[in-house]
């Protein structure tokens, strides 16, 4: 079923070749219609149009970020008839005129931001039901591979190609879709090569389980180590006396030095006091001492023999 896309914010420099190059890899394009400031692109498959809107909306084209939206014919007009674009709330956009002028003024509401309409199939998402595609030609893109799988009646939820040379990855919503894809597409000839499909869901599960087990083991080991370290630290802390802060040690050392200096002063003070008494000025040589004052002094004149005076 064909589908048409509206392109807003187109510059005058963009040509049909630029449009075809912009949408390359998103399926077959039927028609390109360019207007002044906007345009339309018609795809053969509606799903290709939805993928293009989802992936390319807001991308740069000709130096401007273009706006992509779905367009539906209103009332069966032709290429020049009116089309309406639907937002999430079902709001209608004014009809696209087939004339040339004033296109940018009519669609100023698109300048507020990209449309919020989601794809019918939802956004691409990866699942654990995965298929690895080998021997894929380098000329086959992920979109081409996805289209081939769709033609077999299976809808992939996610596709990527050539992250590894000649390999691709497909994801599916259910295991039954995965099996159907392998049954119908394994050995298919694409561009001269027979592709090989391998179920990768079991490998992914085993890897995730082994990773989770190894992580849990490593975590338990780390916890044991941390517990042993904490216990040893607590024991060493309890055995060793508590450390004193620098301030306390400094203050205590100062108080000890002060007390020592005070003791030294006290011990020195009694030894110095008698010395002070000894240092007192001695009496002059001519003066008598107190002991001599009390005792009578003998003089040579007092003795009778020395004086020579007698009774004679």
UniProtKB/Swiss-Prot annotation:
A GO biological-process term: gonad development
Record SUPFAM superfamilies: RNA-binding domain, RBD
GO cellular component assignments: nucleus
GO molecular function, one term: RNA binding
Ranges annotated as biased composition (Gly residues): 74-90
UniProt biased composition (Basic and acidic residues): 103-121
Residue ranges with Basic residues bias: 206-259
Sorted UniProt keywords: Developmental protein, Differentiation, Growth regulation, mRNA processing, mRNA splicing, Nucleus, Phosphoprotein, Repeat, RNA-binding, Spermatogenesis
Annotated segments matching region Disordered: 69-125, 196-312
A Pfam entry, by short name: RRM_1
Record flagged with keyword Nucleus: yes
Segments forming domain RRM: 3-73, 129-202
Subcellular localization, as worded in the UniProt entry: Nucleus
Post-translational modification: Extensively phosphorylated on serine residues in the RS domain.
Record-linked PROSITE patterns: RRM
Domain of life (superkingdom): Eukaryota
Keyword flag RNA-binding: yes
InterPro entries: Nucleotide-bd_a/b_plait_sf, RBD_domain_sf, RRM_dom
Gene3D superfamilies: 3.30.70.330
Job of this protein: Plays a functionally redundant role in spermatogenesis and growth rate control.
Family note: Belongs to the splicing factor SR family.
PANTHER family in UniProt: RIBONUCLEOPROTEIN RB97D (PTHR48038), SPLICING FACTOR, ARGININE_SERINE-RICH 1-RELATED (PTHR48038:SF3)
Extra remark beyond the main annotation: RNA-mediated interference (RNAi) of rsp-1 and rsp-2 result in reduced brood sizes and abnormal egg-laying behavior, and the presence of unusual vacuolated structures in some of the secondary spermatocytes, spermatids and spermatozoa.
UniProt protein name: Probable splicing factor, arginine/serine-rich 1
